[in-house]
Amino acid sequence: MQKRLVTRYAMPSAEAADENQRRVEGVFAELAETKPDSVSYIVLRLADDSFVHVSFHNHGDDEVNPIASTAAFAHFQQDHADRRQGGVEQQTAQLVGAYITTID
C-alpha cells in the first residue's frame, strides 16, 4: 500500500532553517546513493523558513520506512526539536493528481 505523508513545521530563525536544510540535503544525498524502490520525496523550504515534506513510499506497517531508516535521516532527526519552533504537523494525504517534469 502506498503511504502518502505531508509533514510541516516552523523554524525559529533563518540560521536554524539553514542547518535544517543542510541536514535535509544529506538525506537526499543518501537516497540518491542507495536508490530505494518506490520512494518519492519532496521537501520545500517556504519563504517564512518553515518546511514542508511530502513523501510517497511503499512499505507495510511491519516494514521499515525507506526514508526514515537512512543514517542521514537519523542525523536530520538529532536535535530536531531544538532546531524547530513548535511541534510537527503530519497527516496522511490522498493523491488527487500529479504532473511532474524535471524539478529544479
Language-model features, listed with the residues they occupy:
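Short, low-complexity N-terminal intrinsically disordered segments enriched in polar/charged residues
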Residues: 1, 19-22, 33
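A short local loop/turn or secondary-structure capping micro-motif enriched for an aromatic residue
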Residues: 14, 60-63, 99
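An amphipathic, aromatic/His-enriched active-site/gating alpha helix that lines ligand/cofactor pockets
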Residues: 26, 30-40, 56-92
